[in-house]
């Protein structure tokens, strides 16, 4: 088990390990716990009451956070024809077709999100699947990153839409803002994410769906919250 430094241990003393905090309390507390020399990301970590081995119980979706993520998301749009212009006008950072696919094959990866129109997904999947898939960047209709409404998709991502999906342990981890956010905005984003999670509860999931929910910062300790507070 790794040993934490003095800074982390001092922060840990501010957290009551036996307390389940309200969302508002946690939003204020994590700001105190963010003492790194950069603007730490605030994340929600949720353990779900699902069997991740069953495909019908996997949780995947998107949510538009009311106050965004506090960072510029570099969006790559892969399209052709008139959809290229639509993507450019919507604010995509990079737009292209076959030539940009080749650029990625050559090692270029300076983007945070990839969207595509359905008519290019054959080439995207066959040529880029092995590169983008393991990084969670391959466009997917279930993730809301494939569609002919590519302009709308780009605008939503730029405004703070995030994708979430459970890992093989049945947990979900998602960014919900920056430590520099006012606590009220952090609380709004946390609640929006939790509502989206609950809206994606699989029909086959039994018992408590949100088994435990924690809020943490990049370098700070985690704070357990009551997701319905």
Swiss-Prot record:
GO CC, alphabetical: large ribosomal subunit
Highest taxon of the lineage: Bacteria
GO terms of biological process kind: regulation of translation; translation
CDD domains per UniProt: Ribosomal_L1
InterPro entries with a match to the protein in the record: Ribosom_uL1_bac-type (IPR005878), Ribosomal_uL1 (IPR002143), Ribosomal_uL1-like (IPR023674), Ribosomal_uL1/biogenesis (IPR028364), Ribosomal_uL1_3-a/b-sand (IPR016095), Ribosomal_uL1_CS (IPR023673)
Disulphide-bonded residues: none
Keywords: Repressor, Ribonucleoprotein, Ribosomal protein, RNA-binding, rRNA-binding, Translation regulation, tRNA-binding
Sections of the chain in a coiled coil: none
UniProt-recorded Gene Ontology molecular function terms: rRNA binding; structural constituent of ribosome; tRNA binding
Protein function: Directly binds to 23S rRNA. Forms what is known as the L1 stalk, which protrudes beyond the 70S ribosome surface. The stalk is preferentially stabilized in 70S versus 50S crystals. Interacts with the E site tRNA, blocking the exit path. This blockage implies that this section of the ribosome must be able to move to release the deacetylated tRNA.
The family this protein is said to belong to: Belongs to the universal ribosomal protein uL1 family.
Subunit-structure text: Part of the 50S ribosomal subunit.
UniProt name for this protein: Large ribosomal subunit protein uL1
Taxonomic source organism: Thermus thermophilus (strain ATCC 27634 / DSM 579 / HB8)
Gene behind the chain: rplA
């Amino acid at each position: 088990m790794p040993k934490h430094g003095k800074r982390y241990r001092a922060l840990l003393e501010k957290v009551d390990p036996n307390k389940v905090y309200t969302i508002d309390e946690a939003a204020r507390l994590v700001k105190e716990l963010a003492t790194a020399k950069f603007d730490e990301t605030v994340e929600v970590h949720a353990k779900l009451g699902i069997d991740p081995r069953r495909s019908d119980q996997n949780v995947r979706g998107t949510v538009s956070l009311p106050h965004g993520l506090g960072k510029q998301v570099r969006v790559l749009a892969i399209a052709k024809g008139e959809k290229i212009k639509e993507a450019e006008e919507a604010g995509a950072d990079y737009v292209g077709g076959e030539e940009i696919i080749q650029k990625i094959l050559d090692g270029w990866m300076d983007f945070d999100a990839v969207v595509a129109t359905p008519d290019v997904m054959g080439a995207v999947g066959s040529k880029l699947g092995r590169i983008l898939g393991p990084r969670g960047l391959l466009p997917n209709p279930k993730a809301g990153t494939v569609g002919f409404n590519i302009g709308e998709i780009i605008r939503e991502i730029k405004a703070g839409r995030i994708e979430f999906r459970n890992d093989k342990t049945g947990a979900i981890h998602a960014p919900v803002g920056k430590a520099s956010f006012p606590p009220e905005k952090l609380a709004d984003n946390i609640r929006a994410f939790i509502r989206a999670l609950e809206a994606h509860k699989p029909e086959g999931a039994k018992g408590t769906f949100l088994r435990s929910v924690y809020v943490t910062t990049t370098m700070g300790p985690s704070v357990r919250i009551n997701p319905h507070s």
